């Protein structure tokens, strides 16, 4: 329990009360959807281990979901790859204002944790549904279940297949939990084996 309490201190120290977001890196006010999903995992664990009480959990969850529901999306589609944790604004990887694309893998991880929270704490179901229903997945997954991320090239969005063995299947699981067909992204093939 001591280790869990010590680990939770990271999320206490790096919590931004203006947005309910947590810095992905110690004392650096930026985060991704992947890192924000990690915060949801930590928040859930802290609550279920009794490190924080229901009131603290609710305060943090309500603020986080309120911010998630109002984030300005990349091209009005999906969350940008990075956000400033103090302002909640879209940023690039140097934490300067702007948009840089979206990661289907990061969003897939967020979808996993939104589903877990919704199932374990149904009182947050409406807020979570509002988040997911506000996202436009049309460029993130195709009818065959292939995941696509986005980046900007000369100011125009480019959508490219996104995934690596393990990460892609994990991201696909998040989409699958919300009813998407992920047959292509859920399959580890093609891959090759090497003799060692």
Where in this protein do the model-derived segments appear?
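Low-complexity, Ser/Thr/Pro/Gly-enriched N-terminal "stalk/linker" regions
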Residues: 1-31, 75-78, 82-83, 177
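Hydrophobic core segments within long, regular secondary-structure runs in both alpha-
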Residues: 1-12, 40, 58-69, 111, ...
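Short, well-structured alpha-helical interface segments that form or flank functional binding sites
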Residues: 6, 34, 59, 105, ...
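Short amphipathic alpha-helical segments enriched in hydrophobics
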Residues: 11, 15, 40-43, 47, ...
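A generic secondary-structure boundary signal that marks alpha-helix termini
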Residues: 13, 48-51, 70, 119, ...
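Surface-exposed patches in mature extracellular/periplasmic domains of secreted proteins
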Residues: 19-24, 51-57, 123-130, 186
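Membrane helical hairpin/interfacial module
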Residues: 27-102
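Extended ligand-binding clefts on enzyme/binding-domain cores
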Residues: 74-107, 113, 117-196
């Amino acid at each position: 329990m001591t280790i869990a309490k010590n680990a939770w201190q990271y999320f206490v120290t790096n919590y931004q009360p203006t947005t309910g977001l947590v810095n992905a890196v110690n004392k650096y006010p930026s985060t991704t959807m992947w890192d924000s999903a990690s915060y949801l995992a930590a928040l859930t664990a802290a609550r279920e281990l009794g490190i924080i009480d229901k009131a603290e959990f609710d305060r943090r969850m309500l603020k986080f979901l309120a911010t998630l529901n109002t984030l300005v999306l990349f091209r009005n589609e999906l969350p940008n790859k990075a956000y400033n944790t103090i302002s909640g604004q879209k940023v690039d990887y140097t934490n300067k204002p702007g948009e840089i694309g979206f990661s289907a893998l990061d969003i897939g991880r967020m979808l996993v944790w939104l589903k877990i929270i919704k199932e374990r704490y149904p009182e947050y179901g409406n807020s979570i549904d509002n988040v997911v229903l506000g996202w436009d997945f049309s460029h993130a997954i195709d009818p065959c279940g292939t995941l696509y991320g986005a980046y900007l090239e000369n100011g125009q969005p480019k959508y490219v297949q996104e995934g690596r063995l393990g990460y892609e299947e994990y991201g696909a699981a998040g989409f699958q939990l919300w009813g998407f067909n992920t047959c292509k992204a859920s399959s580890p093939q093609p891959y090759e084996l090497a003799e060692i």
